[in-house]
Amino acid sequence: METPFSQSWHWQAIDPSRNVARAYDLWIETDLFGWTTIERRWGRIGTKGRAVTTSYPDRATADVIAKEIRTRRESAIKRIGVRYRAVV
């Protein structure tokens, strides 16, 4: 559930002919201490994958980092040959 203090994005890149089935999730939330955290999870669909959580002292900094991450997902077609699509 998203609150005014949280946002999330979910993407998948699927191409059976290239054996590509990737998922990428991004969450921005405010923790109990007022810091903004960015949690990223990625990996092959159906696996545990990897996760990284990073904390920032303010929301503005976290928003800049999140925008950079979203921009990188948009460039996947150049890197892996398959475009990430938003999953609702």
Predicted regions span which residues?
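Intrinsically disordered, low-complexity and often Lys/Arg-enriched segments
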Residues: 1-8, 78-88
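Short N-terminal "domain-start" leader segments
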Residues: 1-37
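A positively charged, amphipathic N-terminal helix/segment that binds anionic biomolecules
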Residues: 20-21, 72, 80-85
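A generic structural signal for ordered alpha-helices
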Residues: 4-7, 16, 40, 44-47, ...
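Short aromatic-glycine-(Arg/Gly/Cys) micro-motifs in beta-strand/loop hairpins
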Residues: 25-53, 67
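A short, charged, amphipathic alpha-helix used as a generic interaction element across diverse proteins
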Residues: 48-50, 56-74
